[in-house]
A protein has these predicted regions:
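N-terminal intrinsically disordered, cationic/polar leader segments
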Residues: 1-101, 106-155
Length: 155
């Protein structure tokens, strides 16, 4: 740890070195589930560790909110309208031995109002272009972290 302008700065508890392996670029189909579609691509291609980015539009969406006090996803925003995907970013790792995609998204409606949060299953794709960067190195595994209640990387 060190101090930076009066603030305590912690060093990472663990850092792993990765190198790019493969890059997948494509689009999801009309009415595909946004999260399910990306997850399916990762599972089909055996992508165990990586980064995802998506832009496009959805016909609806469901965003999760993690209540830090309750250590649970307690609030979900259900958006039953057409939305632009301004940004979708996430990572790929293993959770309970399965390939797992964790993604957050920022969406905007026709007036420019934005919504953001944890992407939940159920967002129906209108158009979605994805970029998936597979990483070469130690597989990332998620395990429940007792201090947050979240399944976080263990390595």
């Amino acid at each position: 740890m060190t101090r930076l302008k009066g603030h305590l700065v912690r060093y990472p508890t663990s850092t792993n070195l990765y190198t790019p392996k493969r890059i997948f670029v494509g689009r999801l189909g009309l009415n595909d589930d946004l999260l399910g579609g990306v997850t399916s691509i990762c599972r089909t291609n055996k992508i165990y560790s990586g980064h995802i980015s998506v832009i496009g539009a959805v016909k609806n969406a469901k965003l999760g909110f993690y209540d830090q006090s309750k250590k649970a996803y307690t609030g979900c925003v259900v958006l039953k309208r057409k939305l632009e995907i301004c940004s979708m970013s996430g990572n790929i790792s293993l959770k309970d031995g399965e390939i797992f995609v964790h993604a957050h998204v920022v969406l905007a409606d026709h007036s420019g109002k934005t919504f953001g949060g944890h992407l939940m299953p159920g967002a129906k794709v209108f158009a979605a272009e994805y970029f998936i960067l597979e990483l070469s190195g130690k597989k990332l595994h998620r395990v429940k972290d007792p201090s947050t209640g979240l399944p976080l990387w263990s390595n």
